[in-house]
Amino acid sequence: MSAMKITFLIAVAGHLLCGVCDCLLTYMPGGRFHFEDMKDNGRLSAVFKGMPLRNSLLSMLLGCLAMFLFAFGYLALAHWMRAFSETCAVLMLIGTVMVLTFGVAHHVFCGMPEWLYVKMGRTEEARQLITEFFTKTSVTLIVCYLGFLIFGVSLFVPVVSGWTPLPRWACVFNILPLMLVLMPTRVGGSGNWAGAIMFLGLLLLF
């Protein structure tokens, strides 16, 4: 098995693990968490009732490990692209760095408020605190997904244009269109399931 395929396998494992971590922050004993629940403490408290504190801690810690793992796949693709488009390769590298730096912060900033909310007894004061915290740190989410956008477009254009040895239809194995398909389903961890599908598809094509 080539080194490229090994990095793709590691990336698949990383995205699957990160998807599980997302689900730990999304699906609670009281039901599915929606951001709209943060507007009403009655709804929010009902969702988080009975949630073990270890869930958010595991999500934060394993999420950092997961992003470390899937970094190998993105960096390998950026390096591979250099043979066909130096510009796209640089953009893919920039997008990857944006995802890894701001994405790790965002993952921790999602887990920490949930841990604090439960630790503080799911009170109205706790709800106000975590809402303010999440709002003021939401830039990490924006930059992370901007990085995915830059990476996805920079991979999509060369493949669909025929600049690479991959068949043009291989452009579907790209995190951007896969995320656009999965996100309307509102399933927890949709971005990571999209990433796992992308690397699994590319694993079969390389």
Where are these regions (language model features)?
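Hydrophobic, aromatic-enriched alpha-helical segments typical of multi-pass transmembrane helices
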Residues: M1-F206
